[in-house]
Amino acid sequence: SNKANLKDALMLCESLNLEHKTIEIQPILDAFLSACESVCKTRMGNLSARIRMSLLYDYSALKGYLVVGTSNKSERMLGYGTIYGDLACAFNPIGELHKSDIFEFARYLGVPQCFVDKAPSADLYEGQSDEKELGFKYAEIDELLKALKRVDTQKIARADKNLLEMVEKRIKTNAFKNSMPLIFKDI
């Protein structure tokens, strides 16, 4: 994780009196990478997310806890998450809230503004930003996602064509991420 993000996370945990533990995943990641052929940023990010989740599930088993999901509706609809990584959880209280709604909810809860203003990032590699990777702000994305859900043809027709193309492509390409694995019975 980025040092500033780690510092912020620790500060938030301490201010809320939450138990926390920091585990350095780089040695685990390095061991995996040494066994892999040419690894791009996407594969490295997915691997990092899966290592994090493996450690979270192990720690939850040790402590008798449940892993809480943090993926929101925008990320889920776009497939902007890693199967068995950040998408894995026992339950997800914010899974039906769009990213822009999360910002509003955070304000309502009194989350310090510095956290609300932070650029959304999985922090999988240096300089990574959701909106940079997606090419659009979540406010724009969410407006279109909500219009698509309501079949608001006027809003859809007025949407930026590149945004519409990106959203439709991601929804179609990543739909499988929103389903449980297929189980073949009684074939």
Regions found by a protein language model. Give the residues of each.
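ATP-dependent adenylation/nucleotidyltransferase module used to activate substrates
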Residues: 1-77
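Short, structured coil/loop segments at alpha-helix boundaries
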Residues: 2, 40, 112-114, 153-164
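Secondary-structure boundary/capping residues
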Residues: 18-21, 114-116, 153, 176
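Peripheral terminal appendages
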Residues: 87, 128-187
